[in-house]
Amino acid sequence: NIRNQKVDEIPHLFAYSQLLLSVNGNEGLYATCGTDSKFWAKWKEEQITEATYTRLKNTSLPKDKLDLLFNHRPAKVRDEYLSLIAGGELVVTDQDRLLVSLLRHDRLLEMTRLFTLFDKKAGKIVARYQQVFGIKALIERITSFDEHGARNGGVIWHTTGSGKSFTMVFLSKALIWLKVLAQCRVVVVTDRVDLEDQLARTFASGGALSDKDKKDAMATTGKRLAEQIGKGNERIIFSIINKFGTAITLPECYNDSPDIIVLVDEGHRSQNGSNNIFMQQALPKAAYIGFTGTPL
C-alpha cells in the first residue's frame, strides 16, 4: 500500500480511495492515502458483538454466491474453502473484525462522509475508532433534551497529542451533514489567542468552514461576540472565553435557542467561576461539550 502510493509507482490508483486496509489473514490495520506506516491503526468495534462476527464468518454461502466468488479461480481454491467450512466453527480473527466493521455499506459511507478530512499540513486523515465512537456518543447526547428544553452536553477526554482538534472538526462536520442537527450553530470557545487561531486554521483546513467563513467566524471583540450570538447567522463562531464578560453586558448578547452547540477547548481550566456563568447566561439552552487533555 505505502510503496505503491509513491510518485514513481502508481499514485493515481489511490486518487479515489477513501479507506485503505492492510491484512494478512489474521491481523488488519486501516488508514487512508498518504498515511505514514506508524499511523496505521487497529480498529476496536463498540457496536458489533463478538457473536455477530462468529455468525457471519460461519454462515454458509448459497451456490450462486459461491459461483461468483470461485468460478474464475482454480477449483482447488473452492475446495479448500468448502473444506474449511466443513471442518467446524471458524475462529474470528482481527482481520475479520476489521473487514466486517469498516466495509459494511453503512459504515463505509459514514467513514467517508463524516470521518475523513483533508488537512493542509497533515494531508488526508481518517478518524480513529475512539474518535468515531466518541462523536457518535456525543451526537446521541446532543439530540436529547433536559426538562428545561436545553440540549444535553458532555465531556471528551483526549490524551495529549491524540487528535483533539480533529475530533472537534469531525464533530462540526457531523453537525453540518446530519439532517437532525443541520440547523445547529457551533460556538468554539478557547482560553488563549494562539489556541483560537490554531483551531480556526484546523477547521478551515479540514473543510468545516471556508476562508471567508473563517474571517466572519472570529469574535474579535466582546461587542462582536454579542452581535454574533444575538443577531448573527454564522454557522461557526470562535471566541476567547473572557470576551463573554464584556458581551454579556450588552442587551443583544442572548440567544435561548437549543440549536447551539458550544465546544469548550481545555475545559478543565477555563470553566470555573464567572466564565461558565457568563456563557450560561448568554446561551441558556445550548449544549455544552468540554474537551480536555487532563485526566478527569
Residue ranges and their predicted role:
Residues 1-185, 194, 198-210, 233, ...:
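ATP-dependent helicase/translocase motor core
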Residues 98, 124-128, 162, 189, ...:
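Hydrophobic alpha-helical scaffolding
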Residues 220-237, 253-254:
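Conserved motor-coupling elements within RecA-like helicase/translocase cores
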Residues 193, 215-226, 241-246:
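Conserved helicase motor
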Residues 2-3, 32-33, 40-43, 245-251, ...:
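Signature of the SF2 helicase/ATPase Hel1-core->accessory helical subdomain module
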Residues 150, 182-183, 231-234, 256-258, ...:
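Short loop/turn elements that form and flank the Walker-type P-loop nucleotide-binding site
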Residues 24-26, 192, 239-243, 266, ...:
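A short beta-strand-to-loop transition that corresponds to the Sensor-1 phosphate-sensing loop
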Residues 188, 237-239, 262:
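Hydrophobic positions in the central parallel beta-sheet of the AAA+
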